[in-house]
Swiss-Prot record:
The lineage of its organism: Eukaryota, Metazoa, Chordata, Craniata, Vertebrata. This is Phospholipid phosphatase-related protein type 5. Belongs to the PA-phosphatase related phosphoesterase family. Keywords: Cell membrane, Membrane, Transmembrane, Transmembrane helix. Induces filopodia formation and promotes neurite growth in a CDC42-independent manner; impedes neurite growth inhibitory-mediated axonal retraction. It comes from Mus musculus (Mouse). The gene is Plppr5. InterPro entries: P_Acid_Pase_2/haloperoxi_sf (IPR036938), P_Acid_Pase_2/haloperoxidase (IPR000326), PA_PP_rel (IPR043216). It is found in: Cell membrane. The chain crosses the membrane at residues 6-26, 62-82, 122-142, 196-213, 225-245, 252-272. PANTHER family: LIPID PHOSPHATE PHOSPHATASE (PTHR10165), PHOSPHOLIPID PHOSPHATASE-RELATED PROTEIN TYPE 5 (PTHR10165:SF17).
Length: 321
C-alpha cells in the first residue's frame, strides 16, 4: 500500500483545483461577458451565402442548447460511474487483484479507494476537456467573426443607402446593419460550431472509455452498437445545424475536428487510455534493464595471467608443506 505525504497530496490537489477554476472562469468570460471583442467581418451585397431565412432563436432548434448541454454533462457522468462500479465489483468477485489499482494511503488517516480515485480522475478530466472545448470554440468565433448563413436576415442592411447597385460591392463596418445588435453579434460567431464540437467531444470521450474499459465477454456487438450510436448522435447534431441554416458546413467540420482532437489528446496523453497504474515491479525491472550493458564481451585470460596464477599456487603449496 503506497504511502504518500499529506503535504504533497494537498499541494497537487490545490494546484489542479486552481487550473480547473481558471479554465472555468475563462470559459465564463468568453460565454457571458464582452471582455473579448468579436471581429467584425464584412460581406458582399446580396451575397447568397448569407441570405438564408432566419430559423428563429436557439431554443426553437431541434437540438436546443438545454438538451445538448444536459446530455453532454449527464450521460458521461452516468456511464463512467456505472462502468467503474461494475469493473471494481467484477475485480472483487473474480479476485483479480493484479489488474486492480492499489489503495493509496495519504498520511495516517486518509485512504483513497481505487474506485473513487478512478471515477474522480476520469470525470475531472472530462469536465476539464468540456470547458477547454468551449474555450477553443469561443476563441475561434471571436477571432474569425464568421457570418451565419442567415446573417443578412438579421442584419437588414439598407442597400439603397449603402449604394449596392452591384453584387460585387463589399460592405464593411457595423453601421451597415439596422437590425437587433444582440442578434447580429450572435450571427457573427459561427466558426467553429460549438454544438458540433461539444457533441463530438462527449461522444469521442465516451466511445474511447467504453472500448478501453469494458472487456467482458458477450460485448462484441454491444460495444460497437453503443459507440456508433453515440457518434451518430454527434454527427446528426452537426447535420441539424446545417439543415436549419445556423451554421455552414465548414463551421461544423471545424467543430468536429476541435472536439475529436481534444478528446483524443486527453484520453491518450492524460489518462493513458483509462488504464490503471503500472505495478512497481515493472519499474524495478526497467531500472535493472537500463543498467545492463548494451553488449557482453567475454573476458579472455592472457598467458601471462595463467603463469602468474600457477606460480601463486606453487608458492602457496610450498608454504603449506
Amino acid at each position: 500500500m503506497p504511502l504518500l505525504p499529506v503535504a504533497l497530496i494537498s499541494s497537487m490537489l490545490y494546484f489542479q483545483m486552481v487550473i480547473m477554476a481558471g479554465t472555468v472562469m475563462l470559459a465564463y468570460y468568453f460565454e457571458y461577458t464582452d471582455t473579448f471583442t468579436v471581429n467584425v467581418q464584412g460581406f458582399f451585397c446580396h451575397d447568397s451565402a448569407y441570405r438564408k431565412p432566419y430559423p428563429g432563436p436557439e431554443d426553437s432548434s431541434a437540438v436546443p442548447p438545454v438538451l445538448l448541454y444536459s446530455l453532454a454533462a449527464g450521460v458521461p457522468v452516468l456511464v463512467i460511474i456505472v462502468g467503474e462500479t461494475a469493473v471494481f465489483c467484477l475485480q472483487l468477485a473474480t479476485r483479480d487483484f493484479e489488474n486492480q489499482e492499489k489503495t493509496i494511503l495519504t498520511g495516517d488517516c486518509c485512504y483513497i479507494n481505487p474506485l473513487v480515485r478512478r471515477t474522480v480522475r476520469f470525470l475531472g478530466i472530462y469536465a476539464f476537456g468540456l470547458f477547454a472545448t468551449d474555450i477553443f470554440v469561443n476563441a475561434g468565433q471571436v477571432v474569425t467573426g464568421n457570418l451565419a448563413p442567415h446573417f443578412l436576415a438579421l442584419c437588414k442592411p439598407n442597400y439603397t443607402a449603402l449604394g449596392c447597385q452591384q453584387y460585387t460591392q463589399f460592405i464593411s463596418g457595423e453601421e451597415a446593419c439596422t437590425g437587433n445588435p444582440d442578434l447580429i453579434m450572435r450571427a457573427r460567431k459561427t466558426f467553429p460550431s460549438k454544438e458540433a464540437a461539444l457533441s463530438v467531444y462527449a461522444a469521442t470521450y465516451l466511445t474511447m472509455y467504453i472500448t478501453s474499459t469494458i472487456k467482458a465477454k458477450g460485448t462484441r456487438l454491444a460495444k460497437p452498437v453503443l459507440c456508433l450510436g453515440l457518434m451518430c448522435l454527434a454527427f446528426l447534431t452537426g447535420l441539424n445545424r446545417v439543415a436549419e441554416y445556423r451554421n455552414h458546413w465548414s463551421d461544423v467540420i471545424a467543430g468536429f475536428l476541435v472536439g475529436i482532437s481534444i478528446a483524443v489528446f486527453l484520453v491518450v496523453c492524460v489518462v493513458n487510455n483509462f488504464k490503471g497504474r503500472q505495478p512497481e515491479n515493472g519499474h524495478i525491472h526497467r531500472d535493472n534493464v537500463a543498467r545492463m550493458p548494451m553488449t557482453n564481451i567475454p573476458r579472455v585470460e592472457s598467458p601471462l595471467e595463467k603463469v602468474t596464477s600457477l606460480q601463486n599456487h606453487v608458492t602457496a603449496f610450498a608454504e603449506v608443506t
